[in-house]
């Protein structure tokens, strides 16, 4: 839809997604197949605390520069799995970077969410459904600087 709008600057379309939206962004930047190869492409992508597990199992690679921001203490999405996914794509992928915020949990960029234990999550790294979630001021500040810099490239 966006690519068909007359006001769109086609060379500047980027993807940005958080959590499940970040997973969707990572799926969307995989190599194109079939008729999709003829469509306009994205300039870049940013995925913030995405779960990389299923993508890692697919021999993921990106066709556009992709930035992943994730907390080192995230219990919903494993930073180690995202790093493994990106490392596995080296040599067959566009530039992909994972930036891990040590000690940061899921929702680290929320403007004002005290760190708290939440339960009932469908996905958690340990399978318990319990995760910590909340703002990490240093990670938030860095992400607010890092994302626009990435998108300007």
Specify the residue positions occupied by each region the protein language model found.
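Primarily recognizes the serine-hydrolase "nucleophile elbow" in alpha/beta-hydrolase
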Residues: 1-63
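A general structural signal for well-ordered alpha-helical segments in protein cores
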Residues: 22-25, 82, 144
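Short beta-strand/loop motif that positions the catalytic acidic residue
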Residues: 68-70
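Acidic catalytic loop of the alpha/beta-hydrolase fold
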Residues: 73-77, 106-107
């Amino acid at each position: 839809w966006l690519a068909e709008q007359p006001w769109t600057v086609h060379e500047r379309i980027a993807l940005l997604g958080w959590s499940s939206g970040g997973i969707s962004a990572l799926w969307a930047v995989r190599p194109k197949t079939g008729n999709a190869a003829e469509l306009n492409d994205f300039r870049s992508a940013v995925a913030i605390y995405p779960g990389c597990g299923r993508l890692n199992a697919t021999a993921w690679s990106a066709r556009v520069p992709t930035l992943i921001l994730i907390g080192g203490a995230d219990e919903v999405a494993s930073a180690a799995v995202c790093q493994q996914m990106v490392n596995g794509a080296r040599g067959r992928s566009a530039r992909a970077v994972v930036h891990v915020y040590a000690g940061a949990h899921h929702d680290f960029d929320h403007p004002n969410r005290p760190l708290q234990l939440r339960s009932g999550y469908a996905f958690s790294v340990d399978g318990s459904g319990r995760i910590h979630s909340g703002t990490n001021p240093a990670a938030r500040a860095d992400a607010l600087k890092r994302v626009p810099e990435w998108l300007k490239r």
